[in-house]
Structure formats: structure tokens, C-alpha cells
């Protein structure tokens, strides 16, 4: 059984409609009333039900109240900002840190122009793009781990 209704091309009435260029309007399920009046509201109602159900069954836990006179020794950003936080923390000049962060997207923009190959080619046969990805991934992981250690061990991660 199929979800898609296939037209019967042996039907002479359908062949006449197709010859006039109007067959696509006369078979299958119409999109206008069904999608906009049934599928979309049902999806929104399901999403709203999930959100309300989760907020009722698993409310957020409140932490301890903030104390303005007792600040932590080191304030860390969210985990996805760890690499940029460590880059700004390790580089001696803040302008150099900002330029290093701006160089990342600029360097990624140049990769397709440097490696001029077919876009449908196997990614394992694109050595520059693969090496750029691997180098960037491991650098981001290294900088992210380094943000969690003290600044004197941020570069070496305590290995040397």
C-alpha cells in the first residue's frame, strides 16, 4: 500500500485532462484546505500540549537566591562559549583575540574557493576541506577544555 495516489493513465477522461494540461488539479489530495485547516492547527495544538504538559509535570527547579556580596572566584560562560572565552583569556592582547575570532569565519569562507572541485564529489576526496574541519574541530575541543582549567594550564591542559 502506498501513501501516494497514483493516477490511472489508462482512463480516457484523465488522458483528455492531461492533454489539456489540467490533470494535476483533479486527482490526489488538495493541499489548501487540508494542510492549512487541519495539519497545521493540529501540529500547533500538539506542540502547545507538549510544552504545557512538560511545564506542569516537570517545573523548573529554583536555585539558591543570589547573594550580591558573595561572588564566585571565576565566572564561566555557557558551554558553547568555552572556546571563544578561552581564546580571549589566553591571548595577551584583547584586540588580537577579537581578530582571531573574526579570522575563523573568514578562513572558512575561503575554503570553497581554494579547493575548486565538484560539489557532488565524495567529501573524503576533498583533502583541504576535510583537514580544515578536523583541525577546527580539535582546536575547538582543545579550547573548550582549556576554558575549564586555570589560566596557567589553559594552553597545555596540564599535560606538560
From Swiss-Prot:
Give the SUPFAM superfamilies listed for this entry. a domain/subunit of cytochrome bc1 complex (Ubiquinol-cytochrome c reductase)
Q: What are the record's GO terms for cellular component?
A: chloroplast thylakoid membrane
Say which family it is in: Belongs to the cytochrome b family. PetD subfamily.
Q: What is this protein called?
A: Cytochrome b6-f complex subunit 4
Source organism per entry reads Phaeodactylum tricornutum (strain CCAP 1055/1)
Q: Does the keyword Ubl conjugation apply?
A: no
Annotated membrane-spanning segments are 36-56, 95-115, 131-151
Task: List the InterPro entries hit by this protein, alphabetically.
Answer: Cyt_b/b6_C, Cyt_b/b6_C_sf, Cyt_b6/f_cplx_suIV, Cytochrome_b_C_euk/bac
Annotated keywords: Chloroplast, Electron transport, Membrane, Photosynthesis, Plastid, Thylakoid, Transmembrane, Transmembrane helix, Transport
UniProt GO MF annotations: electron transporter, transferring electrons within cytochrome b6/f complex of photosystem II activity; electron transporter, transferring electrons within the cyclic electron transport pathway of photosynthesis activity; oxidoreductase activity
> Per UniProt, what is the membrane topology?
Multi-pass membrane protein
Free-text function comment from the UniProt entry: Component of the cytochrome b6-f complex, which mediates electron transfer between photosystem II (PSII) and photosystem I (PSI), cyclic electron flow around PSI, and state transitions.
Location in the cell reads: Plastid, Chloroplast thylakoid membrane
Q: Which GO terms describe its biological process?
A: photosynthetic electron transport chain
Amino acid at each position: 500500500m502506498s501513501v501516494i495516489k497514483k493516477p490511472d493513465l489508462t482512463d480516457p477522461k484523465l488522458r483528455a485532462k492531461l492533454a489539456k494540461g489540467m490533470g494535476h488539479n483533479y486527482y490526489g489530495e488538495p493541499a489548501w484546505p487540508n494542510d492549512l485547516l487541519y495539519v497545521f492547527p493540529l501540529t500547533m495544538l500538539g506542540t502547545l500540549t507538549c510544552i504545557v504538559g512538560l511545564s506542569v509535570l516537570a517545573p523548573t527547579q529554583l536555585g539558591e537566591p543570589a547573594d550580591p556580596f558573595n561572588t564566585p572566584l571565576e565566572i564561566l560562560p555557557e558551554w558553547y562559549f568555552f572556546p571563544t572565552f578561552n581564546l580571549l583569556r589566553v591571548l595577551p592582547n584583547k584586540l588580537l583575540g577579537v581578530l582571531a575570532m573574526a579570522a575563523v569565519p573568514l578562513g572558512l569562507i575561503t575554503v570553497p574557493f581554494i579547493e575548486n572541485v565538484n560539489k557532488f564529489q565524495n567529501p573524503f576526496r576533498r583533502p583541504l576541506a576535510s583537514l580544515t574541519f578536523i583541525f577546527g574541530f580539535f582546536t575547538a575541543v582543545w579550547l573548550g577544555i582549556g576554558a575549564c582549567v586555570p589560566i596557567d594550564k589553559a594552553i597545555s591542559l596540564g599535560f606538560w
